[in-house]
Structure formats: C-alpha cells, structure tokens
Amino acid sequence: MSNNETIYESVIADLLKEIDRATAKHPFFPCRKHPAFVLIAEEYLELTRAINDNESDARVIEEAFHTAVTLLRFITEKRKNPDLHAENERIEEK
C-alpha cells in the first residue's frame, strides 16, 4: 500500500465518522434544492473564513470535513429519494 492510499483510507475513515456524527446531531437533511444549497453555502463560507483568517490547519480541516459531509449528505438524499426531489422541484416551479 502506498502512502497516498494510506492517507486516503484515513481521510475516508474520518469522513465516515463525521457523517455519523452529523447525522446523529442533525438527522433531517432538507430535500428541496434551495434549503440544501443554503446549508452547503454556509459550510463553504465557514471553510473560507477559516482559511482567510489563517486559523490552524486542524480548524481548516475540520471545516473542510463539514463541507464534504454536507455535500455527501446532499448527494445521498438525491439518490435515495429521486421521486421526492422531482416532486419538490415541481412544487417549487408553481
């Protein structure tokens, strides 16, 4: 196993732990695009602030994980409930 594989495995393991933590803390994830977009934007802005404010690497990585988890939860919900999302999109168009 190369060093990159080891690093990727470690990151993925940490990401899975963070997904479990986030899901336990916030079990509901919005299905409509607009509320989901707001959550994604908030996490991205927190990551951007951590970088721009020269916060510690640990803090930047923490915010990067939060952003990644939010994106993964969005993707997961889209795949789990495609009919629900299609219905929500029709409702939003009215």
Residue spans of the language-model regions?
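Flexible "arm" and connector segments at domain edges
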Residues: 1-94
